[in-house]
Curated annotation (Swiss-Prot):
Gene Ontology biological process: ribosomal large subunit assembly; translation
Top-level taxonomic group: Bacteria
Name the UniProt record assigns to this protein: Large ribosomal subunit protein bL20
Species whose genome carries this gene: Corynebacterium aurimucosum (strain ATCC 700975 / DSM 44827 / CIP 107346 / CN-1)
A matching Pfam family: Ribosomal_L20
Length: 127
């Protein structure tokens, strides 16, 4: 079996790692071993944070919906429950968008949710 010389492939691989490590601080952008270590960590962080971003956005949408719902005298959980009872299928992303950019439409949805809720749920709780 012939001997394999890795020169071309190894240089190509190292060049690719160093290219993707551009912008890293200090030796991490210049030395191959340090760059590869940092690059592997950065790929791990990127993978993890792509998943974390989804829950962060959901939390943001819920906060925006709750704030706008309270301006319409209804809480977030009663709004969502009322929309389900009224068979209005709007996801949280769209609800948050309506709350920020089209408050009249959001208010109409709040009124529909209030109307769909049972009367005992609409009544304010006695202290």
């Amino acid at each position: 079996m012939a001997r394999v010389k890795r020169s071309v492939n190894a240089k190509k691989k190292r060049r690719a790692i160093l290219k993707s490590a551009k912008g890293y601080r200090g030796q991490r952008s210049r030395l191959y071993r340090k760059a590869k270590e940092q690059w592997l960590h950065s790929m791990t962080y990127a993978y993890r944070d792509r998943r974390a971003r989804k829950s962060e956005f959901r939390k943001l949408w819920i906060q925006r919906i709750n704030a706008a719902a309270r301006m319409n005298d209804i809480t977030y959980n009663r709004l969502i429950h009322g929309l389900r009872l009224a068979e209005i299928e709007v996801d949280r992303k769209i609800l948050a968008e309506l709350a920020v950019n089209d408050f009249e439409a959001f208010s109409a949805l709040c009124e529909a949710a209030k109307a769909a809720l049972p009367e005992d749920v609409n009544a304010p709780k006695a202290a």
